[in-house]
């Protein structure tokens, strides 16, 4: 079965599908729905909403942050981007779409942000499934931690 997964910057035509996203009960603990974070991301310079598409249908979402102020609490690398708010709508869980999207991410970032040499993210230490997804997608745990809303978060790094 072919998985035609691609990444695209948010476009207004994605909105109806993004507004209908639902999360699994487990995901509700650790991430936000696109409709909860999209309007804020669109209103702030250096935030880039990205949609995960399956055959041009939105199935996932995340935000890339380039703001030095936002990045400061995660990394001292001025050439890093922060990935946040990754979500996959519940009906598409378990199909490998999130992993495929994370495998596409380095090329996407390199193409649109040629100055970037690292992608960083924070994952809650209790979110084992997400941690495994990121590690299988090339992210590394270099031992850096921070405290988030639900406790300890691991700062993971993907060097480009």
Curated annotation (Swiss-Prot):
Keyword Acyltransferase: yes
Gene name per UniProt: ybbJ
PROSITE patterns per UniProt: GNAT
Domain N-acetyltransferase: 5-160
InterPro entries named among the record's database cross-references: Acyl_CoA_acyltransferase (IPR016181), GNAT_dom (IPR000182)
Keyword NAD part of the UniProt annotation: no
Domain of life of the organism encoding this protein: Bacteria
Keywords: Acyltransferase, Transferase
One Gene Ontology term of the molecular function aspect: acyltransferase activity, transferring groups other than amino-acyl groups
Enzyme class, first EC level, given as a word: transferase
Coiled-coil stretches noted in the UniProt entry, renumbered to this chain: none
UniProt-recorded name of the protein: Uncharacterized N-acetyltransferase YbbJ
Enzyme Commission no: 2.3.1.-
């Amino acid at each position: 079965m072919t998985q035609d997964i691609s990444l695209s910057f948010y476009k207004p035509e994605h909105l109806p599908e993004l507004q209908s996203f639902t999360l699994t009960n487990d995901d509700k603990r650790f991430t936000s729905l696109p409709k909860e974070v999209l309007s804020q991301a669109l209103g702030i310079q250096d935030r880039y909403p990205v949609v995960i598409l399956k055959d041009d249908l939105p199935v996932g979402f995340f935000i890339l942050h380039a703001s030095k102020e936002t990045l400061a609490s995660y990394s001292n690398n001025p050439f890093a981007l922060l990935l946040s708010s990754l979500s996959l709508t519940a009906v598409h869980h378990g199909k490998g779409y999130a992993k495929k999207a994370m495998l596409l991410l380095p090329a996407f970032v390199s193409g649109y942000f040629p100055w970037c040499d690292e992608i960083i993210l924070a994952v809650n230490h209790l979110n084992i499934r997400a941690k495994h997804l990121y590690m299988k997608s090339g992210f590394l745990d270099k031992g850096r931690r921070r405290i988030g809303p639900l406790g300890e978060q691991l700062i993971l790094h993907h060097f480009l």
